[in-house]
C-alpha cells in the first residue's frame, strides 16, 4: 500500500467501494468488507491493478476470511431516477446495511460518504491505500464482471463480456446498430441519443 493511511481508533472497520459508475449498462455494484486481523490476506490492492486471475483468487480468499462482507447495488432504473451519484450512495448504504456485523467505523473510497448510522470517512485513492477498501473493490468488480458475462450470453451482439458496459468505440457502435436493451441506463447521453430522447 502506498501513501500510508492512518486508521481511525475503532475495533470493527468496514471498507466500501463501488464498481460501475461509468458504464452505459447494468447496475452499479458496491461491496462492504470487515477484515479479520487474525486472518490476514496478502496482496490486496486496487482491483483495477490486478489481473483477472488474481482478482478471482482474492475474491475467494476475502469471502472466506472476512469477518463480514456484503454486496449492494442500484439498478439502471434507480440510476436513471436518482442520477449516478445518488444511486451509488444508495448502493453503498445497502452494502453496509447488509453486513451481519455492524461496523464501528466505515471507510469509503472517493471523496464523499453516504449517510450512515456510524461514523465514516471518505478516503481518496482508498482502493490502493486501505486494505478493507481494496477488498471491497475486488468483491464489487468480480461481481459486476460476472454479471456482464451473464448479460453477454443474453445479448451476444453487444460484446458486454469484453467492455463490461463501458462506452468503448465497440459498445457505442453496437448501441447505434442494435439499439438499447432494457438493461441500458436511459439517462446516459449515448443511450439517450439512440432512444431519441435528446
Curated annotation (Swiss-Prot):
InterPro entries: RNase_HII, RNase_HII/HIII, RNase_HII/HIII_dom, RNaseH-like_sf, RNaseH_sf. Pfam families: RNase_HII. GO terms for cellular component: cytoplasm; ribonuclease H2 complex. Keywords: Cytoplasm, Endonuclease, Hydrolase, Manganese, Metal-binding, Nuclease. It is an enzyme of class 3 (hydrolase). Residues 11-198 form the RNase H type-2 domain. Signal peptide: none annotated. Its cofactor is Mn(2+); Mg(2+). Its EC number is 3.1.26.4. Its main location: cytoplasm. Manganese or magnesium. Binds 1 divalent metal ion per monomer in the absence of substrate. May bind a second metal ion after substrate binding. The keyword Zinc does not apply. A divalent metal cation binds at residues 17-18, 109. It is found in: Cytoplasm. It comes from the Bacteria. GO terms for biological process: DNA replication, removal of RNA primer; mismatch repair. Belongs to the RNase HII family. This is Ribonuclease HII. It comes from Yersinia enterocolitica serotype O:8 / biotype 1B (strain NCTC 13174 / 8081). The gene is rnhB.
Amino acid at each position: 500500500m502506498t501513501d500510508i493511511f492512518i486508521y481511525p481508533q475503532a475495533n470493527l472497520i468496514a471498507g466500501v467501494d463501488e464498481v460501475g459508475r461509468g458504464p452505459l449498462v447494468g447496475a452499479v455494484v458496491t461491496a462492504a468488507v470487515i477484515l479479520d486481523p487474525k486472518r490476514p490476506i496478502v496482496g490486496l490492492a486496487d482491483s483495477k491493478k490486478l489481473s483477472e486471475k488474481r482478482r478471482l483468487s482474492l475474491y475467494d480468499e476475502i469471502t472466506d476470511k472476512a469477518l463480514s462482507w456484503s454486496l449492494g447495488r442500484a439498478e439502471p432504473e434507480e440510476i436513471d431516477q436518482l442520477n449516478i451519484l445518488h444511486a451509488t450512495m444508495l448502493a453503498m448504504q445497502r452494502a453496509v446495511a447488509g453486513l451481519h456485523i455492524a461496523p464501528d467505523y466505515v471507510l469509503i473510497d472517493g471523496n464523499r460518504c453516504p449517510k450512515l448510522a456510524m461514523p465514516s470517512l471518505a478516503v481518496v485513492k482508498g482502493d490502493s491505500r486501505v486494505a478493507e477498501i481494496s477488498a471491497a473493490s475486488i468483491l464489487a468488480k468480480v461481481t459486476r464482471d460476472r454479471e456482464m458475462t451473464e448479460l453477454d450470453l443474453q445479448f451476444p451482439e453487444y460484446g458486454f463480456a469484453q467492455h463490461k458496459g463501458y462506452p468503448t468505440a465497440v459498445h457505442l457502435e453496437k448501441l447505434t446498430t442494435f439499439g438499447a436493451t432494457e438493461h441500458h441506463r436511459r439517462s446516459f447521453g449515448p443511450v439517450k441519443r439512440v432512444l431519441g430522447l435528446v
